[in-house]
Amino acid sequence: MKKWFVCLLGLVALTVQAADSRPAFSRIVMFGDSLSDTGKMYSKMRGYLPSSPPYYEGRFSNGPVWLEQLTNEFPGLTIANEAEGGPTAVAYNKISWNPKYQVINNLDYEVTQFLQKDSFKPDDLVILWVGANDYLAYGWNTEQDAKRVRDAISDAANRMVLNGAKEILLFNLPDLGQNPSARSQKVVEAASHVSAYHNQLLLNLARQLAPTGMVKLFEIDKQFAEMLRDPQNFGLSDTENACYGGSYVWKPFASRSASTDSQLSAFNPQERLAIAGNPLLAQAVASPMAARSASTLNCEGKMFWDQVHPTTVVHAALSEPAATFIESQYEFLAH
């Protein structure tokens, strides 16, 4: 973390702006997980996950997610989105041979994928929103684990700066203990604690880097907390139960059949085993298979679409304050 701090401080002299000016942006470059995925995982998994319908056009929700709804506030906004379902902040595949870490992405590799085909432009606003999968999907939920996640985020941001990124916006995490998945796993207390600790670490990081003028923090947890505290103000009546109780995929499968399952014929043997052993698909074994008819479910008043992901109504409610914050800190210039 020290090298990242020194690197950015070294760039302060090169980042001269008037005190009352807002840096301009015309494109958002997004790095994150399923909360921001607009179809990358669906494409990567050859239309297998998440099954659509019931999932909306490859999104992990029943409608558009917050990121794409930003275009309502910023007409003409260009988005380069590397976020996909399942990624962790930490590259666990580098420290473990467990197959479940070999197919799911991580933040550092998302950056690599972006740099292989694109580059950071002077008018890019880079957003990082990641970490929930480390804690909730994979169970790395101690304070030491949170420090490792923080370091992965800071290292990735440092790499972005070294590759030309000028403006970086960090998103913190909602209270993961309020997620239906945390309740079903009986990890409410641990999930709440680690997400709060994560947010404090991220706040401290943002404060340390404030002198650079390049890194800001959006505390999206406050919007989630407001929805839980006063759900009626957002048209919500149920903040605990998922609208949809099925799986991510139409046809459940288990590790023992992964090598022969015809549904996985498009993947090589290593990919099949990694997919079958991954927590992202764990509910595909134990839960009812995805149902196309579920796309017609009435989710009015529901905060959560499934055990992990919010409904599109909640995404809209998150998009509005995100847009307000972005507008207050940056100047949008449509191309």
From Swiss-Prot:
Gene3D superfamilies: SGNH hydrolase. InterPro entries: GDSL, Lipase_GDSL_AS, SGNH_hydro_sf. It comes from the Bacteria. The keyword Coiled coil does not apply. PROSITE patterns: LIPASE_GDSL_SER (PS01098). Keywords: Acyltransferase, Cholesterol metabolism, Lipid metabolism, Signal, Steroid metabolism, Sterol metabolism, Transferase. It is an enzyme of class 2 (transferase). It holds the Pfam family Lipase_GDSL. Its EC number is 2.3.1.43. One of its GO terms (molecular function) is phosphatidylcholine-sterol O-acyltransferase activity. Changing S36G: Loss of activity. Changing S34N: Loss of activity. It catalyses: a sterol + a 1,2-diacyl-sn-glycero-3-phosphocholine = a sterol ester + a 1-acyl-sn-glycero-3-phosphocholine. GO terms for biological process: cholesterol metabolic process. The active site is at S34 (nucleophile), D306, H309. Residues 1-18 form the signal peptide. Fatty acid transfer between phosphatidylcholine and cholesterol. Belongs to the 'GDSL' lipolytic enzyme family. This is Phosphatidylcholine-sterol acyltransferase.
